[in-house]
Structure formats: structure tokens, C-alpha cells
Amino acid sequence: MSRYSYQSLLDWLYGGVDPSFAGNGGPDCAAFLSWQQRLLESVVVLTLALLEILVALRHILRQTKEDGRGSPGSQPEQVTQRPEEGKESLSKNLLLVALCLTFGVEVGFKFATKTVIYLLNPCHLVTMMHIFLLACPPCRGAIVVFKLQMHMLNGALLALLFPVVNTRLLPFELEIYYIQHVMLYVVPIYLLWKGGAYTPEPLSSFRWALLSTGLMFFYHFSVLQILGLVTEVNLNNMLCPAISDPFYGPWYRIWASGHQTLMTMTHGKLVILFSYMAGPLCKYLLDLLRLPAKKID
């Protein structure tokens, strides 16, 4: 008989989820909404999410074809690297090491507390995307991931503004929570400053923002909700609202669908604007702090 049976595997995945903590899971959390309301919300949101994905993909593919055709005789755009871009910079390697250490400690906490299932939450998935972007050389796949994750950062803002930390009891577990969510902003801003292949869509274009919105809602109302109902684990608050949710109540998912659509569509644009303004501002401050050169006779 195998040492790790099916039951022990399930215990390893979510056996440490304690339903006595508010908003963590359990039968009461799973029954927070009636099945009729949950089904109706899921059908409506999943339908809208699929429409958003299809519309966004249609416009993205059309734009890709137009860019590929270009002027007569032109060649499709290729992802090229300048010689200096091919070399891994020290700052990029340090950021990759810091992110891997932070996420590695977080994964260790999940194993130690038998809550590995929480690694399916969006913030952890975006962290994995950032590790991929820092480790992988620029290519078409990396550019797609970069443009998608730019509009998946609103979860980090919510986690910082309305933290759910009542289950983080191990030493330094709380600190890792904040460090990881701050790093979710550091990596994309660094890649924007680095430039090169990692160029966001124009501020006036919302194709990738719409695609990210559709993918996020589809993931929440399909994968996370189904797994949450089966395991009675409140994955990213799909079963019941968080204790810090300002819209706590039976309609919290309707409110969340509205404000998260707005945030997903606009938050990434604000991050891009901030990166554009922060670069010249930092350069200006450094110039002010720089000591004047001594005149040599």
C-alpha cells in the first residue's frame, strides 16, 4: 500500500483549514448563499466572462494580423533582443532571487499548515507569472503573460487595503503576506522601466484589460467556486465574504463583480501611468541630490 493514500493527500491539501476562523471555510461558509442564488450568479457571470474573452480575443487577433501585414512587403514583427538585453542584469537577478525566496517561504507555510490549496488563489498565480517573466528571456509567450498580468494586480491592492490575516499565526507569516503583495507591484513596475519587449498596450486600448477581466471572472466562478464547494474551503471568498469585506452580506459577490470589473479595467492603466511618471521623478530627485562636481583648475 502506498505510504501517501488518497485521504492523506487531501489532508495535506486542505486538512489544516480551520472553519472556526471567520471566512476561512466550513459548512456555514459554504451555505452562506442559497444554491439558487449561487447558480444564477454563476450562470450570468460566466456568460459575461465568456463574451468578454471572445470579444477581446477577436480584437487582439485582428490587431495582430494588421500589425503583421503592415505596409506592403513588410515582415511580421519579431521579438528581438539587443545585445545588452540578452545579458541578465544584476538588478533583475536580485529581484528574481528575492521573489523566489519570498514565494518559497510562503509555499513552505502552506505545507506546514496543510493549506496548500490556497496556492490556487490569484495572487499566488500572479506571483508565479512574475517569476516566469523574470526568469524567461523575452519571447512571444512572455509578452502575452506580461500584458495579461498588468491587469491582474488589483487583487494585491485589495489584499493590502483589506488584509485577511486572522489565520496567519506562524512566526513571520504575517510579514511574508505583506512582502509578497508589495512585490506584486515591484516586478511589473521594474519590467516597465526596463522596457524593451515588455511594452504595455496603449493607454487608450482596453483589449488586454478586457481579456484579463474575462479570464479572472471565469477562473473564480468555475475553478475556485467548484473546488471551494467540494472542499468547503473559501478560496478567494467565493463561498462567503471576508471578515474585512465592506460589502459583507448576501449580495457581496454582485458588488464584487461590479467594483472588480472597474478595478481590473482601470487599475493596470494607473500602474502604467505611475511607472511613466515615477521614472522621470526619480531621475530628477537623484539629480537634485547629486553633489556638484568640483571644478579642477
Swiss-Prot record:
Region (Disordered): 65-85
InterPro entries named in the record: TMEM164
Gene Ontology CC: membrane
UniProt KW Heme keyword: no
Alphabetized UniProt keyword annotations: Membrane, Transmembrane, Transmembrane helix
Compartments (UniProt record): Membrane
Ranges annotated as spanning the membrane: 40-60, 93-113, 116-136, 142-162, 172-192, 210-230, 262-282
Any Gene Ontology biological process: positive regulation of ferroptosis
Catalytic activity: 1-(1Z-octadecenyl)-sn-glycero-3-phosphoethanolamine + 1-octadecanoyl-2-(5Z,8Z,11Z,14Z-eicosatetraenoyl)-sn-glycero-3-phosphocholine = 1-(1Z-octadecenyl)-2-(5Z,8Z,11Z,14Z- eicosatetraenoyl)-sn-glycero-3-phosphoethanolamine + 1-octadecanoyl-sn-glycero-3-phosphocholine
UniProt topology in membrane: Multi-pass membrane protein
Family to which the UniProt record says this protein belongs: Belongs to the TMEM164 family.
General function of this protein: Positive regulator of ferroptosis.
Name this polypeptide is given: Transmembrane protein 164
Origin species: Homo sapiens (Human)
Organism ancestry: Eukaryota, Metazoa, Chordata, Craniata, Vertebrata
Gene: TMEM164
